[in-house]
Amino acid sequence: VASGRSEVHPQKKLDSVDQRQLFSAVGQAKLINRYYELFREHSIPVGQVLTTKESFGTRRHYLNQKNCMTVMLENNVIPIVNENDTISVSELMFTDNDELSGLIASMMDAQALIILSNIDGIYNGSPADPGSSVIREIDHGKDLSNYIQATKSSFGRGGMLTKTNIARKVAD
């Protein structure tokens, strides 16, 4: 959505759904082209998989997605998976891409899930506090609520809380 916002300047005021659909349609094309170019430099083919939360709700759609990505991986094609924001209904959208990545990792029986962030990790205090440090290892079941702020970056819908919740679900 953000990528498309920089490209398109609507002639009239749009409601939030129309904006999301317009910007995501344009942004998705930019995004997949960028991934294509980056991976092509290493002779690695990529393919686009657009999904919705509804696609995880029925066995038929779930298995179809899994089969698609399995065939891609068997043929050394990297699936670039993203929510299909152009048709996603607001009430049924993923919390964020972390939730989507967790569902994909579980679906594909992935050996690992790497969740990226603009924060170095979970701190034992406020990340802005110079006396705080990253917690290097977290025991399974440890309560992290005292360490995680519910804030999120201006770039997305989630935050560190969502990341840790997804990590716990996938690890179980």
Where are the model-predicted features located?
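Nucleotide/pyrophosphate-binding catalytic subdomain
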Residues: 1-171
